[in-house]
Each structure stands twice: as structure tokens, then as C-alpha cells.
């Protein structure tokens, strides 16, 4: 894998993290350097480690992982997305500090959900016999940069007076949309449509 190919893969993998970071910035509205570091570091770290984990596993458990990885990502994003949408309608100041997506379990869940595709990439590179060290480093660094950028872009969007509460609501919708896209890309809806036709037909 040459440098250009490695960068292309890294950018593609960073898109979900970028979108989630924007949604997180919208949710927070005010972003501190510490929050930026936590989110970018964890997203970048998980994005770098997942390909290594996938590469290490190789063909041994590939079929098993591919059966449930997309459902795991969808479940995590759905849970956090619904939570953000619910809190968009709660107006107390206490709520502003109750769910900081850059801390605790929520941060880990987001990091895992946005790095599932990187696990699959690691599996693929293992099959192709490609060394994982350089791709993992590039993938992690690119994700870190995209996450930091997305977080502050979301913060700027949330400050627009015309957005208000709708911006926070949109953040939750974005997360759920990403989860649905993951299911779509794994053919879940095609399978469901086929089953429906067979039952109705």
C-alpha cells in the first residue's frame, strides 16, 4: 500500500468520526482545549488500534466479526443519538453538564462506534499480507485531525442564533443517520426487503 492509498483509506475512515465530532461540537456549544484533546485523542487512538486488532485476528474470526460489527456500531450510535435528541428538549442548566460526549462511557462508546470500519480494514490488510504499522499510524493521525476540526466546526455552527435547540437535535439525528448508513452498507435493508417479499409473495 503506497502513501496515497494509505491517506485515501485514512480519510475515508475518518468521515464518520468527523461527522460525530461535528454533532458533538453542536451539543457542547462551548469546547475547551481539554475536551478537544480528549475526543480527538480517543477517536484517533481507537481508529489506530482497531486496524491492528483486525489485522491480528486475520481470517480466524473474520466471518464471525463481520456478522455483528455493524449492529454494534448502529446500537451505540442509536443510543447516544436518542439521548442527545432527548436532551435537546430539556432546558435546565443542569442538563448542559449531564452528558459531555468527551467524557466517560459516552466517549468510549463513540470511539468504538466510529472505529468499527477500521477493524474491517485491518482484517482486509491481513488477508492481503500488507504490514499494518504504517497504515495504523496514518489512520490514527488523520482521524485525530479530522475529529478536532469537526468538533470546532460543530461549535461554530451551534452559535448561530437561527439554529438554537434545532442544532442539538440535528446532532442526534446525524448520529442515528450514520448508524443507519452503516446498516445499509452491510446490506441489512436488502436482506429485510428480500425476506418481506418472500413472506408477502
Swiss-Prot record:
It is a multi-pass membrane protein. Pfam families: Mntp (PF02659). The keyword Magnesium does not apply. Probably functions as a manganese efflux pump. GO terms for molecular function: manganese ion transmembrane transporter activity. The keyword Phosphoprotein does not apply. One of its GO terms (cellular component) is plasma membrane. Its main location: membrane. The gene is mntP. The chain crosses the membrane at residues 6-26, 39-59, 105-125, 127-147, 169-189. Keywords: Cell inner membrane, Cell membrane, Ion transport, Manganese, Membrane, Transmembrane, Transmembrane helix, Transport. InterPro entries: Mntp/YtaF, Put_MntP. It comes from Nitratidesulfovibrio vulgaris (strain ATCC 29579 / DSM 644 / CCUG 34227 / NCIMB 8303 / VKM B-1760 / Hildenborough) (Desulfovibrio vulgaris). It comes from the Bacteria. Belongs to the MntP (TC 9.B.29) family. It is found in: Cell inner membrane. This is Putative manganese efflux pump MntP.
Amino acid at each position: 500500500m503506497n502513501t496515497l492509498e494509505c491517506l485515501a483509506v485514512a480519510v475515508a475512515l475518518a468521515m464518520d468520526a468527523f461527522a460525530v465530532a461535528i454533532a458533538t461540537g453542536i451539543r457542547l456549544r462551548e469546547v475547551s482545549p481539554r475536551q478537544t484533546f480528549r475526543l480527538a485523542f480517543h477517536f484517533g487512538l481507537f481508529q489506530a488500534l482497531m486496524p491492528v486488532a483486525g489485522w491480528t485476528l486475520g481470517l480466524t474470526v473474520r466471518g464471525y466479526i463481520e456478522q455483528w460489527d455493524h449492529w454494534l456500531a448502529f446500537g451505540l450510535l442509536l443510543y447516544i443519538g436518542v439521548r442527545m435528541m432527548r436532551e435537546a428538549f430539556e432546558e435546565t442548566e443542569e442538563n448542559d453538564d449531564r452528558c459531555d460526549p468527551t467524557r466517560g462511557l459516552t466517549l468510549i462508546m463513540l470511539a468504538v462506534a466510529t472505529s468499527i470500519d477500521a477493524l474491517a480494514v485491518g482484517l482486509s490488510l491481513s488477508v492481503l499480507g500488507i504490514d499494518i504499522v504504517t497504515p495504523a499510524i496514518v489512520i490514527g493521525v488523520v482521524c485525530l485531525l479530522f475529529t478536532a476540526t469537526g468538533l470546532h466546526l460543530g461549535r461554530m455552527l451551534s452559535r448561530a442564533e437561527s439554529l438554537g435547540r434545532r442544532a442539538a437535535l440535528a446532532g442526534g439525528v446525524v448520529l442515528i443517520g450514520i448508524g443507519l448508513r452503516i446498516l445499509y452498507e452491510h446490506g441489512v435493508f436488502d436482506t429485510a426487503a428480500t425476506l418481506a417479499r418472500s413472506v408477502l409473495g
